[in-house]
């Protein structure tokens, strides 16, 4: 028996720290931000992460002789300092693709973050980024439809889509809920949506809501001549109930359903995405609970990882924050998410938080959704940041209009079309935002009132989770 298989305990770095290793194109690469306990060498901390997230255990075991450990083990091949942080460092780890079940995001996350975060040798650990090899991506179904198909289904081109969450999000009866949906859609929105925590409560059972929403959509389409939709939340207590709700939405001829992908889980989400593809249904994804996982700058999973995983698991729209609204997220970081959702190839760019080149092959893109504390004054910045392949959702910024939800929807539609027209004419819409909106307000009393109502409303808080750049 060779020395390395002698019984006992040995340091992780003897096996899992391999600074001379050159990653293969087929390797899954991960970047962890590590903060070790005082006195533990960086190489030992990084190697421990590589070991526990792949083949390692705390003791040398005889059964290692029954496999090729050198082939299957994760390898920490590089360590970098974190700019501006003397306590933490980046550990870059390569995993052979055979460690993971083909196309299973659940299995990837179970391996990479399932147990290692509880290590005593670590004070903090954060998964910053993953490079999925194209061989793994080809095993994932991805978005059930994608951006181009969704535009064709909804017959909407050349601009961002407009939506809003129904407010109050809890407490309305099914009939009154449908009434609010109708007001928003007839006013000019493309979509309305259930909020993340609307499922099937005593005040509003899901069948009742679905039926009244379907009626509201039909009336709004007849009145406006436009295709409309509402994100019907099918998230449920069991997969069987989830599919029952999805099937009922299909029976009502609805174009889109919704899922809370983190609370619902990646297994449920992947299954629902495949159902949507088979049944011609669009799938909106809410990220409820994400900040519990991604907001701490030293511990958890960065949202760019969750966004990548969602694109692979499947969804046609995903919330990404707004930059300018009430939710966390700076501009460069958010642009990094948007790139990962929509582009076919995303180069390494630390200024946007992307640690690796990411080739998405021919996988369809996902609409980026801006939602949370936005109103008409934000419209120029939103159009500039998110571009056309996005959904801009104004909840309070629609329903809070003094003349009601229909007027709020009309104000948002006029503001959007004014910004798109100005952009297409070559104007710098962020610099000229006030002039563009005030000019449009002269021809729209709904917009003029909205501009006056929201003129003092700002959310100027510093970002907690900032990019680690010099």
Curated annotation (Swiss-Prot):
Keywords: Bacterial microcompartment, Calvin cycle, Carbon dioxide fixation, Carboxysome, Lyase, Magnesium, Metal-binding, Monooxygenase, Oxidoreductase, Photorespiration, Photosynthesis. Substrate binds at residues 115, 165, 169, 287, 319, 371. Its cofactor is Mg(2+). The keyword Hydrolase does not apply. The record marks 326 as: Transition state stabilizer. It catalyses: 2 (2R)-3-phosphoglycerate + 2 H(+) = D-ribulose 1,5-bisphosphate + CO2 + H2O; D-ribulose 1,5-bisphosphate + O2 = 2-phosphoglycolate + (2R)-3-phosphoglycerate + 2 H(+). The active site is at residues 167, 286. GO terms for cellular component: carboxysome. The keyword Lyase applies. It comes from the Bacteria. Signal peptide: none annotated. GO terms for biological process: photorespiration; reductive pentose-phosphate cycle. Its EC number is 4.1.1.39. Mg(2+) binds at residues 193, 195-196. One of its GO terms (molecular function) is magnesium ion binding. Binds 1 Mg(2+) ion per subunit. Pfam families: RuBisCO_large, RuBisCO_large_N. RuBisCO catalyzes two reactions: the carboxylation of D-ribulose 1,5-bisphosphate, the primary event in carbon dioxide fixation, as well as the oxidative fragmentation of the pentose substrate in the photorespiration process. Both reactions occur simultaneously and in competition at the same active site. Heterohexadecamer of 8 large chains and 8 small chains. HAMAP family: RuBisCO_L_type1. Belongs to the RuBisCO large chain family. Type I subfamily. This is Ribulose bisphosphate carboxylase large chain. It comes from Synechococcus sp. (strain CC9311). The lineage of its organism: Bacteria, Bacillati, Cyanobacteriota, Cyanophyceae, Synechococcales.
């Amino acid at each position: 028996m060779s020395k390395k298989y002698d019984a006992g305990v040995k340091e992780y770095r003897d096996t899992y720290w391999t600074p001379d290793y050159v990653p293969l194109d087929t390797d899954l690469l991960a970047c962890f931000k590590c903060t070790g306990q005082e006195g533990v060498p960086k190489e030992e901390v990084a190697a421990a992460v590589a070991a526990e997230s792949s083949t390692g255990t705390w003791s040398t075991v005889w059964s290692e002789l029954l496999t090729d450990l050198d082939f299957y083990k994760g390898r920490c091949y590089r360590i970098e300092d974190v700019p501006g942080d003397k306590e933490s460092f980046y550990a870059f780890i390569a995993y052979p693709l055979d460690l993971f079940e083909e196309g299973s995001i659940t299995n990837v996350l179970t391996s990479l973050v399932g147990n290692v975060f509880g290590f005593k040798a670590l004070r903090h650990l954060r998964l910053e980024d993953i490079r999925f090899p194209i061989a793994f991506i080809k095993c994932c179904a991805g978005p059930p439809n994608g951006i181009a198909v969704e535009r064709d289904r909804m017959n909407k081109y050349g601009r961002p889509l407009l939506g809003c969450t129904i407010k109050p999000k809890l407490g309305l009866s099914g009939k009154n809920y449908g009434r609010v949906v109708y007001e928003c859609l007839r006013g000019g929105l493309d979509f309305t949506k259930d909020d993340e925590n609307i499922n099937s409560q005593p005040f509003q059972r899901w069948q009742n809501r679905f039926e009244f929403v379907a009626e509201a959509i039909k009336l709004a389409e007849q009145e406006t001549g436009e295709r409309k939709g509402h994100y019907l939340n099918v998230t449920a207590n069991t997969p069987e109930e989830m599919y029952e709700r999805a099937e009922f939405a299909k029976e009502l001829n609805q174009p889109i359903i919704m899922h809370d992908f983190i609370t619902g889980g990646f297994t449920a989400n992947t299954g629902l995405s495949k159902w949507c593809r088979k049944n011609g249904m669009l799938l909106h994804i809410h990220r409820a609970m994400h900040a519990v996982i991604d907001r701490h700058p030293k511990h958890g999973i960065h949202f760019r990882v969750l966004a990548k995983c969602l694109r692979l698991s499947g969804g046609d729209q995903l919330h990404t924050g707004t930059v300018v609204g009430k939710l966390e997220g700076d501009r460069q970081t958010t642009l990094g998410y948007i790139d990962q959702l929509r582009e076919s190839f995303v180069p390494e760019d630390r200024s946007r938080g992307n640690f690796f080149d990411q080739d998405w092959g021919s996988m369809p893109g996902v609409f980026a959704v801006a939602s949370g504390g936005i109103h008409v004054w934000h419209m120029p910045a939103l159009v500039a940041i998110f571009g056309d392949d996005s959904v801009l959702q104004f909840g309070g910024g629609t329903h809070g209009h003094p003349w009601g939800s229909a007027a709020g929807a009309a104000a948002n539609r006029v503001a959007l079309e004014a910004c798109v027209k100005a952009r297409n004419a070559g104007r710098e819409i962020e610099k000229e935002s006030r002039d563009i909106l005030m000019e449009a307000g002269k021809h729209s009393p709904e917009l003029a009132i909205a501009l006056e109502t929201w003129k003092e409303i700002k959310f100027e808080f510093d970002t907690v989770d900032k990019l680690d750049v010099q």
